């Protein structure tokens, strides 16, 4: 356990700061990431460098995105030219500009739990240029991300992310691994974007579709979780033949596999495109 926890810095609630201090957990995360010398490695919210230190023991240079101005200056003084510090909000950051042809762009971080879902959706915009992502998140969020249909955890977040990524729950992290300790358990998730075929289609287990249409469909489906889809998706009957596609509206939203939502969104998108033409 690290003794120089805050190094004079007071954790700020508005930034959702909980500093990782357990060396066993830290090295478990770094081993899961397995950084290589040729990687373009970017850490979101490095804080006091709990992950940055051991990562830089394995690679010569890396980059970070940090919002807290006090920490930005600390990081620049501490690591010098080995660390390129981007001062700003990861929610607004253009990660595409960090991509280098021929070098894997890898994103890692102990994400602030108060912005984790918006940040995950923001990062989807850059998935075509990202090799993989490893994030520490609230355990409940990770369970929702990797949830299977039919489980209570399965929902909008599960579907939207599983369409774009292969995901794996890597390890659990107890509150005592942080200072100050959060009130919830944490976990690390690995996210690998599905690659694309030469024609641009996603090489995933699910059909490709308009992600905006999918988001609208899934939001409507889960708007009343306790009711069957006949109540939440009936407004789409004039746009798609549910019976013809074998889509059973007698189910609840969490009982429908990801692929069926994607196929529904694809048909709706095709119909909208045909009408526009």
UniProtKB/Swiss-Prot annotation:
<feature type="binding site">
    <location>
        <position position="20"/>
    </location>
    <ligand>
        <name>S-adenosyl-L-methionine</name>
    </ligand>
</feature>
<feature type="binding site">
    <location>
        <position position="66"/>
    </location>
    <ligand>
        <name>S-adenosyl-L-methionine</name>
    </ligand>
</feature>
<dbReference type="GO" id="GO:0052908">
    <property type="term" value="F:16S rRNA (adenine(1518)-N(6)/adenine(1519)-N(6))-dimethyltransferase activity"/>
</dbReference>
<comment type="function">
    <text>Specifically dimethylates two adjacent adenosines (A1518 and A1519) in the loop of a conserved hairpin near the 3'-end of 16S rRNA in the 30S particle. May play a critical role in biogenesis of 30S subunits.</text>
</comment>
<feature type="binding site">
    <location>
        <position position="110"/>
    </location>
    <ligand>
        <name>S-adenosyl-L-methionine</name>
    </ligand>
</feature>
<feature type="binding site">
    <location>
        <position position="89"/>
    </location>
    <ligand>
        <name>S-adenosyl-L-methionine</name>
    </ligand>
</feature>
<dbReference type="Pfam" id="PF00398">
    <property type="entry name" value="RrnaAD"/>
</dbReference>
<feature type="binding site">
    <location>
        <position position="18"/>
    </location>
    <ligand>
        <name>S-adenosyl-L-methionine</name>
    </ligand>
</feature>
<keyword id="KW-0694">RNA-binding</keyword>
<keyword id="KW-0963">Cytoplasm</keyword>
<feature type="binding site">
    <location>
        <position position="45"/>
    </location>
    <ligand>
        <name>S-adenosyl-L-methionine</name>
    </ligand>
</feature>
<dbReference type="InterPro" id="IPR029063">
    <property type="entry name" value="SAM-dependent_MTases_sf"/>
</dbReference>
<keyword id="KW-0489">Methyltransferase</keyword>
<dbReference type="GO" id="GO:0005829">
    <property type="term" value="C:cytosol"/>
</dbReference>
<dbReference type="InterPro" id="IPR020598">
    <property type="entry name" value="rRNA_Ade_methylase_Trfase_N"/>
</dbReference>
<protein>
    <recommendedName>
        <fullName>Ribosomal RNA small subunit methyltransferase A</fullName>
        <ecNumber>2.1.1.182</ecNumber>
    </recommendedName>
</protein>
<dbReference type="InterPro" id="IPR023165">
    <property type="entry name" value="rRNA_Ade_diMease-like_C"/>
</dbReference>
<keyword id="KW-0808">Transferase</keyword>
<keyword id="KW-0698">rRNA processing</keyword>
<dbReference type="InterPro" id="IPR001737">
    <property type="entry name" value="KsgA/Erm"/>
</dbReference>
<keyword id="KW-0949">S-adenosyl-L-methionine</keyword>
<comment type="similarity">
    <text>Belongs to the class I-like SAM-binding methyltransferase superfamily. rRNA adenine N(6)-methyltransferase family. RsmA subfamily.</text>
</comment>
<dbReference type="GO" id="GO:0003723">
    <property type="term" value="F:RNA binding"/>
</dbReference>
<dbReference type="InterPro" id="IPR020596">
    <property type="entry name" value="rRNA_Ade_Mease_Trfase_CS"/>
</dbReference>
<dbReference type="InterPro" id="IPR011530">
    <property type="entry name" value="rRNA_adenine_dimethylase"/>
</dbReference>
